[in-house]
Amino acid sequence: MRKQIEIFTDGSCLGNPGVGGIGVVLRYKQHEKTLSKGYFQTTNNRMELRAVIEALNLLKEPCEIILHSDSQYMKNGITQWIFNWKKNNWRASTGKPVKNQDLWIALDSAIQPHTIHWRWVKGHSGHRENEMCDELAKQGAENPTLEDTGYRQD
């Protein structure tokens, strides 16, 4: 039987584009692990995607996951839009290249071993774990140490 994991993620960007951060809370039974990372030049959407990728990359085996995020962009992208993007060689319905393609490809790969139930939570509404992730993401953004490889200003 697969481990049942609950994951909460958030991304933050001060400026958009600007410095950004990710915040992650992973819960397995009674154990919680947190993660905060800061990036130099990036965007809020890239941080939302990167938070989920980083969280999934912490897992050592295939898991049953409930993943909570306040990002409609991430949730809709991975549960709806990505299928057509892949079919259309990573082109949006406008014919233009999909933004953040590098991270969408990484996220698509990161979800493969797992069964994931995607949950959207309203941001800044007092949801304990979402507020924790928001704070962790802001801490990361205030102390950037990493380059957001793949970020380009279009």
UniProtKB/Swiss-Prot annotation:
Pfam families: RNase_H. Mg(2+) 1 binds at residues 10, 48, 70. It is an enzyme of class 3 (hydrolase). Endonuclease that specifically degrades the RNA of RNA-DNA hybrids. The keyword Acetylation does not apply. Its EC number is 3.1.26.4. One of its GO terms (biological process) is DNA replication, removal of RNA primer. The gene is rnhA. Residues 1-142 form the RNase H type-1 domain. It comes from the Bacteria. This is Ribonuclease H. It catalyses: Endonucleolytic cleavage to 5'-phosphomonoester. Its cofactor is Mg(2+). Binds 1 Mg(2+) ion per subunit. May bind a second metal ion at a regulatory site, or after substrate binding. Mg(2+) 2 binds at residues 10, 134. Its main location: cytoplasm. Belongs to the RNase H family. It is found in: Cytoplasm. One of its GO terms (cellular component) is cytoplasm. NCBIfam families: PRK00203.1 (NF001236). The keyword Transcription regulation does not apply. Keywords: Cytoplasm, Endonuclease, Hydrolase, Magnesium, Metal-binding, Nuclease. Monomer. GO terms for molecular function: magnesium ion binding; nucleic acid binding; RNA-DNA hybrid ribonuclease activity.
